[in-house]
């Protein structure tokens, strides 16, 4: 049986050529110095290269400095989320870990025993604050979107009731926040020295376009991760899998339904985009171009997710149901778990200035290690 991702139809204007990859090594060195990855660890390096390569698809036209910021966001996303998914924390500990990370963005501080992901979050937050300058509203939108994403992780992980998969509508509603698209969009706003009027961000069409792209990106991710999640006994939160179970249909029918949903949201997005561009009165050509850059980023989140998925060892497999992804991974056979120390490394040449410190809060002894699972097979 062969399924094809070509059934997903994007407008030609959404096509992209990925950016350069020279930023990946730079972000790796940063991540080691911040204690996110272990130095000279091959598995961590492979994991890093996989997840950080997303940035060149999401920001294909940005310069090196901004690509690095996108890479830092990807490192933070994957390591923090996978730590909460790893099963090493009970409910109370998870809530404390989430509160600590929210405080990093809220207050711009870390604890004395800050984890690698917490230090990466502060590092990126500080960069964004400097880049925003007087654009306080832009900075606030970025940190608010990051806090919103952090707060979404535990509720999404508890979406199953009595072990049953959710309905696709409930799944999509929660996942559009949990997928992490909104921090990518607000980071793009940080990257642009724009002249867009503040009220644009509260236009319901702009908000809905963001939600549409988040759902599209979610469903693409669910398609390409299907084989991996089923093999890892994690298919109950994958629509391609749970639609089969709920409706007692074969994989081909489930795939057809998911693709239909993607194409529906693409059409809804393009209608909203056309409506906005026809009705909005831009003050000058720069303001219009700035907004077009924001729209392009939304396009690239969807099309970039698809392109990245067709080449990453994270999902590609000779036995994938998708013909575009049937590639022999060149990565070594790794275990499903990668232990990542979160304390400071022995490298004394830290890339950041000393962050503001708060009084240490003891979560548990297990907080010394984040276990990042399933970054790569």
Curated annotation (Swiss-Prot):
GO biological process: terpene biosynthetic process
Motif segment (DDxx(x)D/E motif): 81-86
EC number: 4.2.3.160
One matching Pfam family: Terpene_syn_C_2
Motif NDxxSxxxD/E motif: positions: 221-229
Residue ranges, compositional bias (Low complexity): 335-356
InterPro entries attached to this UniProt entry: Isoprenoid_synthase_dom_sf (IPR008949), Terpene_cyclase-like_2 (IPR034686)
Enzyme class: lyase
Keyword Methyltransferase: no
Keywords: Lyase, Metal-binding
Domain notes: Contains several highly conserved motifs that are important for catalytic activity including the aspartate-rich 'DDxx(x)D/E' motif and the 'NDxxSxxxD/E' motif, both of which are involved in complexing metal ions to coordinate the binding of the isoprenyl diphosphate substrate in the active site.
Function (record text): Terpene synthase that converts its substrate farnesyl diphosphate (FPP) into the sesquiterpene protoillud-7-ene.
Family of this protein: Belongs to the terpene synthase family.
Protein name (database record): Terpene synthase 1
